[in-house]
Amino acid sequence: MKTSESKILLKRFIAVILFVICISATSQAQLGSYAGSFSRMGFGARGLSMGNAMVSDIFGNINGIYNPALSAFQIDGNVNLGYTFLSLDRKLNFLGFTKKFKLPKQQQGGAGITLAWVNAGVSDIDGRDNDTRQIGLFSTFENEFYLGTAFLLNENLALGVGFKLYYAKLFEEVTSTSFAIDLGAIYKASKNLSLGIAIKDFGAKYEWKTSEIYGSLGNTTVDKFPRILDLGASYVLPKNFGIVSIAVQQYFSPDYEADSTGVVPEKSNNTVLRLGTEISIVPQVKFRVGLDRIDFSADDFAGNLRPSFGIGLDKSFSKTINLGIDYSFQLEPFSHDAIQNITVAFKFK
């Protein structure tokens, strides 16, 4: 496909995204605190600094947890280890591996795999009784274990499926385990343009049982994850000057059950826009800028925005080994401190 045709296709795709956003903007709902929010904050410094607009990005260092189909385009093995600096005694850490493989006796096509672990939690929670006396310090954690597989149907089209295992602890003996599935696809429209789609968190939920603590007075509370639809496009700028990505993310609110008063919470969907770019000053240095959580339906539009920037440095030690360090800085709503992440990226052939 010629460059001019790629630009036309990209413009049409952006028009579709804007049309979806305009329709969704009629909703009065705001992006709420859905269950499993830690798994939607982003994965690694590169993704965070580019506004998490990564569902279609096959041109940079790929993290397949954004879309299970991405791994089919990661030729070199890519290992990421990330640590996030957060306020309010929170933690968020990443460990991931993504690589494309050729199947036995296969001349064309191939398959890809992603293995990842996301860990989040809050420590030093001050516990008090009804008389405000301190009873100890508590902590909570959440984990996501991810296995993503992808298959190239041809050199330009890949399909993928991701398997997730969530394990979380709310309080002492109150834990929950959940299994979920992601589906994704990538289409490489030209050498400079790729399109991506992913549907995430089929079946994800937390089920909290408190009978271990309260006995017969305990109950079971179910917190369902929202189902998420990601659509995106990534474009390589002329002369390989950089990458520009745009993505739209649709949150489909879970079905709620009636509470003790018989009231069923209102169900509403939310749409957010994501933008990101990566500029290569020299091959070993990359500057990144992004904007996440662009929610046109929010009452406080500016209050939901998450602007970000970052830098990436890498060094080749041989023809088969490359080591990089990525840094991201992202402003967080309702907090005086920014989200900062440092990720070590190790690539090998």
Would you name each region that the model predicts?
Residues Q28-K349:
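Subset of outer-membrane beta-barrel
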Residues K2-I14:
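Bacterial N-terminal signal peptides that target proteins for export
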Residues I14-S24:
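Bacterial N-terminal signal peptides
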Residues L10-K11, F19, G160:
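Compositionally biased amphipathic helical and low-complexity segments enriched in hydrophobic
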Residues K2-S4, C22-A25, I243:
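Intrinsically disordered, low-complexity segments
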Residues E5-S6, C22, Y34, L305:
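A general, composition-driven signal for non-globular sequence regions
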